[in-house]
Regions:
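Walker A/P-loop NTP-binding active-site region of P-loop NTPases
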Residues: 25-91, 262-324
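P-loop NTPase motor core
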Residues: 33, 106-187, 191, 342-426, ...
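Conserved inter-motif catalytic segment of the P-loop NTP-binding fold
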Residues: 59-143, 299-379
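Conserved nucleotide-binding/hydrolysis micro-motifs of P-loop NTPases
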Residues: 67-71, 79, 93-98, 140-142, ...
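Flexible loop/N-cap segments at domain edges
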Residues: 254, 259-280, 285-287, 331-338, ...
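Terminal-proximal interaction/regulatory segments of ATP-powered molecular machines
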Residues: 285, 291, 302-305, 327, ...
């Protein structure tokens, strides 16, 4: 999306980085905008951030409120740690209470001949302060005062004409339950919709949509956001086409020669690899091996774990001598536990994007099963993942994804959702039985960027190391899920149990 042709518009930044990115820099100045949303969706928080950003830029602001008292607004600001110096709060509830019972109508004729006392307070405050930014909170209370839809719309139209002549950028806040009020939406220069839903389990999910802004291009669709201490944090929907970049080809080796041989030399930057297999077969350990190898080569890695704590993830790798704790302390890697009940897919994509912008060149998602639970439906998982992988590929990032399959042995082993077509490399891990012992096998079934071995190798996670054995050609049933080994004991990796020669014991 090209925003260069719209650079001539002066913008009023909102103070919310993600929202300004969506709007291409902020709202065009000297216009009126409608912000719709349910109670608790964050409209007041957005309005305060909008005015505070103006103060930071040396502009004055007015907050005209009918829905909350001045003290309530100051309490909200204190909760976020915001000083309100430079913002004039116009408490219209006080003005309303001073009116007589027979003057509870807010008639504001376009000719500006007759004004209600409530509206006159706003006009007087604006003329006295001469602000660059104005917030009116909210239209729902004004609608009640007007009592008549025609008077109400005439009043909004007159306010629009007045504020346009006053060179103010105005936000009108309104509840989002007034469906079909297209006349109000048409009167404003832009419309911003806030939505929130409560899933069956977990925190509320919030998203926003720019319904319209006249004269500019903006990033369409829904964008996730959260309300945190410090204000709204918006995660723009990730669009890979907005971040074009040609990555330099390079291979990241695992540090295990046998594994690199299996993969035809290693995994390339700008590609994605899926580690597929049943629970406990070594997928996370294999992913940790690539993190350790990349960090040792001076590359920064970012790990997102959905299924276990960072402490356990790092601890397992430490016991295998990978040295991840040292890499973590040296800022060569980061690890974050993701709770799919709390973090939306858009927020997750935004977190990954920030890590990449800060230099991450290897990203691990462990696991896609947890990522899937963050999606309301399967098709959304595929769309989100497609866009995320396309973005990471353009940035030259190696993406390693873990997916656990259901079942342990035989034909019952299957994936909860087929995502293999999205990835460049698919590594299959399986259990097999040989000589009365359960062992693990690793093979590569897909590699887009080059050739790879067709054989199965043994994978062993034991003691203080991860090891990959030589080719085992005496296998059949790899793709059916019923992996059967028909060879002798000598090609297998030695185990560390018992005394003497373990291999001799097998024979």
């Amino acid at each position: 999306m090209n925003h260069d042709e719209f650079k001539g518009f002066e913008r009023a930044a909102t103070g919310i980085e993600g929202l300004d990115y969506i709007l291409g820099g902020g709202f065009p100045v000297h216009r009126m905008y409608l912000v719709e949303g349910d109670p608790g969706a964050g409209k007041t928080t957005l309005a305060m951030q909008f005015l505070l950003e103006g103060v930071r830029r040396g502009e004055t602001g007015v907050y005209a409120t009918l829905s909350e008292t001045e003290e309530e607004l100051r309490d909200i600001a204190r909760a976020h740690g915001w000083p309100l110096e430079g913002i004039t709060i116009c408490d219209l509830q006080t003005a309303e209470e001073s009116l007589k019972a027979d003057s509870q109508y807010t008639l504001f004729h376009p000719s500006e001949v007759e004004l209600s006392e409530t509206t006159k307070v706003v006009i007087d405050t604006v003329e006295r302060v001469n602000p660059a930014r104005v917030v009116f909170d909210s239209l729902s209370e004004m609608r009640l005062l007007a009592r008549d839809s025609l008077r109400y719309r005439r009043q909004i139209l007159a306010l629009k004409h007045y504020f346009t002549g006053s060179c103010c950028t105005v936000l009108l806040l309104d509840y989002g339950n007034n469906q079909g009020d297209f006349q109000l939406q048409s009167l404003t220069h832009g419309v911003l919709n806030f939505e929130q839903t409560t899933p069956g389990y977990g925190a509320q999910r919030r998203r926003l949509r720019v319904q319209k802004v006249r004269g500019i291009s903006y990033r369409q669709g829904y964008h996730d956001y959260v309300i945190d201490t410090g204000g709204l944090k918006v995660s723009p929907r990730l669009v890979a086409a907005d971040h074009p970049q040609v990555a330099t080809p390079a291979v990241i080796e695992s540090g295990l020669p046998e594994l690199d041989a299996l993969l035809g030399g290693g995994l390339e930057r700008g590609t994605s690899a899926m580690l597929l297999g049943p629970s406990g077969v070594g997928k996370s350990t294999l992913a940790a091996q690539y993190v350790a190898a990349a960090a040792a080569q001076g590359e920064k890695a970012a790990v997102y774990t959905f299924d276990e704590s960072p402490h356990l993830w790092i601890g397992r790798a430490q016991r295998l001598g990978m040295g991840l704790r040292e890499h973590l302390d040296a800022d060569r890697m980061s690890i974050r536990q993701v709770d799919p009940a709390e973090l939306s897919p858009g927020d997750f994509a935004g977190a990954v994007r920030r890590e990449v912008e800060e230099g991450a060149r290897v990203v691990v998602i462990d696991s896609l099963n947890g990522y899937q639970h963050a999606m309301p439906e399967e098709r959304y998982l595929i769309l989100h993942l497609h866009e995320l992988l396309a973005y990471l590929s353009q940035q030259g990032v190696l993406t390693v994804m873990v997916m656990a399959q259901t079942g342990i042995l035989g034909e019952v082993v299957q994936s909860p959702v087929d995502l293999s077509y999205l990835t460049d490399t698919v590594v299959l891990l399986r259990y097999f039985e040989a000589f009365g012992e359960v062992r693990k096998a690793i093979s590569v079934v897909k590699r887009r960027t080059g050739d790879h071995e067709r054989y199965v190798r043994e994978l062993r996670v034991e003691g203080n190391r991860l090891s990959v054995g030589r080719e085992l050609r005496e296998f059949h049933g790899v793709l059916s899920g019923q992996l059967t080994y028909t060879g002798g004991a000598s090609p297998l990796l030695r185990n560390s149990h018992g005394g003497g020669d373990p291999e001799a014991g097998l024979e």
